[in-house]
From Swiss-Prot:
Protein family membership: Belongs to the universal ribosomal protein uL29 family.
Gene designation per UniProt: rpmC
Organism annotation: Prochlorococcus marinus (strain MIT 9303)
Keywords assigned by UniProt, alphabetized: Ribonucleoprotein, Ribosomal protein
UniProt xrefs under HAMAP family: Ribosomal_uL29
GO biological process: translation
The UniProt record lists the keyword Hydrolase: no
One Pfam short name: Ribosomal_L29
GO molecular function: structural constituent of ribosome
Any one of the GO CC terms: cytosolic large ribosomal subunit
The keyword Ribosomal protein is annotated on this UniProt entry: yes
Protein name: Large ribosomal subunit protein uL29
């Protein structure tokens, strides 16, 4: 999974961003569960998921701050 560019994330609607954030949080939960039960083989998925989550949360925070400033 390639990391999305910030410009690609900014093109998403607020609803899409929220939906993706929820999906990634669920995925991280599942990954932690798989790791605890020793079923996880691709540990690099943690980093990819956390990075994408951080990008989405950053764009979401930027939008909320710009809306509050307006």
């Amino acid at each position: 999974m390639a990391h999305p560019k910030a410009a690609e994330v900014r093109k998403l609607t607020d609803a899409d961003i929220t939906e993706q954030i929820d999906g990634i949080r669920r995925e991280l939960f599942d990954l932690r569960f798989q790791q605890a039960t020793r079923q996880l083989s691709n540990t690099h998925r943690f980093k990819e998921s956390r990075t994408k989550l951080a990008q989405l949360l950053t764009v979401q925070k930027e939008r909320s701050r710009s809306a509050a400033a307006s």
